[in-house]
C-alpha cells in the first residue's frame, strides 16, 4: 500500500525509555515535528510521568501508556476509566480474557485504544517454560491474540516475528503494535526477537515502537529520519 510520510509518522512510536522527565522533554524537543507518538512506561510514570503525559497531549502528541496492567478485573477497570480521562491514545494490559473484557467495558465511549500484550519480546521458549507456561511463544501469542479479538480489544502488542501470522488471527481492523524494531545493521539490545522497520510493516504491523536506536543515537533526530525513511522504503 502507498503510505505517505505523515501516516508513517503516525505509525512510529518513540519509546521514552529514559531515566527522568528532563531527559524525556529534551528528546521530545529534539525530535520536534518528526515524531507525533510517544510511549511512556514504568520508568517515567513513576518519576512525574503523569504530568508529563498531560504536557505531551497538550502539545498535540499522542501517548502510548505502556502499563501492562494485570490485576483483579474491577481494579483494572477503574484504572482504565481514569487513564481514558487523561486523553491517552493507547494503553497496554496483559492479554488475560476476563481482564480484557473488564477493560473494554471501562473504556467504552472513549478514544482509548486498548492493547493486549501477547508475549514479551524479551522472552523466548526457555523463559516461558521457566515461568510455568507450557506453550511456545508463538502458540501463546496466538491464543492471546484470539482472546483479545474476542474481548473487543483495540489491538495487540507482539514481536514483529509473529506479526504476519497474528494479523491473520486478528483481521485487518485491529492495531498490531510491534516493539523490538531495530534499523538495518544495528545491535539487538536486550530483545531476543527483533526485525527491521520496513519488514515489520510488510509483515502486518500497524505501529512500530522504537526506543534504544533513537534515544541512544549520537543524533536522535537523524536516527528518527533514517527510520522513517526505512519505513517508507518500498511502499
UniProtKB/Swiss-Prot annotation:
PROSITE patterns: OMPDECASE. It holds the Pfam family OMPdecase. Its EC number is 4.1.1.23. It catalyses: orotidine 5'-phosphate + H(+) = UMP + CO2. Substrate binds at residues 17, 39, 66-75, 121, 182, 191, 212. SUPFAM superfamilies: Ribulose-phoshate binding barrel. Gene3D superfamilies: Aldolase class I. One of its GO terms (molecular function) is orotidine-5'-phosphate decarboxylase activity. It comes from the Bacteria. GO terms for biological process: 'de novo' pyrimidine nucleobase biosynthetic process; 'de novo' UMP biosynthetic process. InterPro entries: Aldolase_TIM (IPR013785), OMPdecase (IPR014732), OMPdecase_AS (IPR018089), OMPdecase_bac (IPR047596), OMPdeCOase_dom (IPR001754), RibuloseP-bd_barrel (IPR011060). Keywords: Decarboxylase, Lyase, Pyrimidine biosynthesis. Pathway: Pyrimidine metabolism; UMP biosynthesis via de novo pathway; UMP from orotate: step 2/2. One of its GO terms (cellular component) is cytosol. The active site is at residue 68. NCBIfam families: PRK00230.1, pyrF. Catalyzes the decarboxylation of orotidine 5'-monophosphate (OMP) to uridine 5'-monophosphate (UMP). Homodimer. PANTHER family: OROTIDINE 5'-PHOSPHATE DECARBOXYLASE. Belongs to the OMP decarboxylase family. Type 1 subfamily. This is Orotidine 5'-phosphate decarboxylase.
Amino acid at each position: 500500500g502507498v503510505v505517505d510520510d505523515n501516516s508513517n509518522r503516525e505509525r512510529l512510536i518513540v519509546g521514552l525509555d529514559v531515566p527522568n522527565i528532563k531527559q524525556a522533554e529534551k528528546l521530545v524537543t529534539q525530535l520536534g515535528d518528526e515524531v507525533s507518538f510517544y510511549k511512556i512506561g514504568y520508568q517515567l510514570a513513576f518519576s512525574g510521568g503523569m504530568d508529563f503525559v498531560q504536557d505531551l497531549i497538550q502539545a498535540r502528541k499522542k501517548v502510548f501508556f505502556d502499563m501492562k496492567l494485570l490485576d483483579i478485573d474491577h481494579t483494572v477497570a477503574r484504572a482504565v476509566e481514569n487513564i481514558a480521562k487523561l486523553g491517552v491514545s493507547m494503553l497496554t494490559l496483559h492479554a488475560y480474557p476476563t481482564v480484557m473484557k473488564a477493560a473494554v467495558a471501562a473504556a467504552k465511549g472513549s478514544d482509548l485504544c486498548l492493547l493486549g500484550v501477547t508475549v514479551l519480546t524479551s522472552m523466548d521458549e526457555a523463559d516461558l517454560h521457566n515461568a510455568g507456561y507450557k506453550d511456545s511463544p508463538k502458540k501463546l501469542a496466538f491464543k492471546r491474540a484470539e482472546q483479545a479479538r474476542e474481548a473487543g480489544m483495540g489491538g495487540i502488542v507482539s514481536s514483529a516475528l509473529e506479526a504476519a501470522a497474528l494479523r491473520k488471527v486478528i483481521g485487518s481492523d485491529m492495531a498490531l503494535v510491534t516493539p523490538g524494531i531495530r534499523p538495518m545493521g544495528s545491535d539487538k539490545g536486550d530483545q531476543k526477537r527483533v526485525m527491521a522497520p520496513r519488514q515489520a510493516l510488510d509483515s502486518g504491523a500497524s505501529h512500530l515502537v522504537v526506543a534504544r536506536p533513537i534515544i541512544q543515537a549520537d543524533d536522535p533526530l537523524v536516527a528518527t529520519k533514517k527510520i522513517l525513511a526505512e519505513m517508507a522504503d518500498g511502499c
